[in-house]
Amino acid sequence: MSFGLPTTGMTALKGLREEYAKRTVEGDIGMRYSIHGIVDATDIAHVSELSGLSEQRCKELIDYLSVHTDVVPKDDDDELEALDYALASLAIEVAVTRHAGHLEQYYSPMGISYMQIGKDLTAVKTVIVTGGALIHTKRTAQIASHALFNPLDAFSLKPKEAQVLVDRKYILAAMGILSTEYPQTALRIMKKELVKDGNH
């Protein structure tokens, strides 16, 4: 959580300041029921590049998984594991890009200036991830790294350096409820249960 106000000179905030705690839900991107949403939000070429599979094979597997939503990678299913890695990475990238703010460049009498739309999350120090595709893989840290700033998207205000914690037991929702009455207890449980899975 962060107020996300501009942190650099010559940057103005566009619109109203957002709340300290902000929640977004990306219902159009998911690993099975909304699997086509990931492709729509990025493109099949990105899925192919990250998975190492051909675009045609990615399309075939994605169509199959959209119907057979209970299928998960088995130990010997390298194709499906590679596809899930790509889909989870892109889902996180899209979700955090939408959640974070971004800069727009414009010219003023003072020279190049910037307009900030949304929250500046570049200084956020911790990212917590959860979900089956992140819990049941050995590549959690690699997938979670897609939540962080990418120099190729220079105007994004995603976190630049953040410790990645994994909620492997799906406790976050319960801790949110618990924290309304017992905040210290909820914090203590989260500190114990959230697992460090890479420092980027």
Report the location of each language-model feature.
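Helical "lid/coupling" subdomains associated with nucleotide-phosphate turnover
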Residues: 1-200
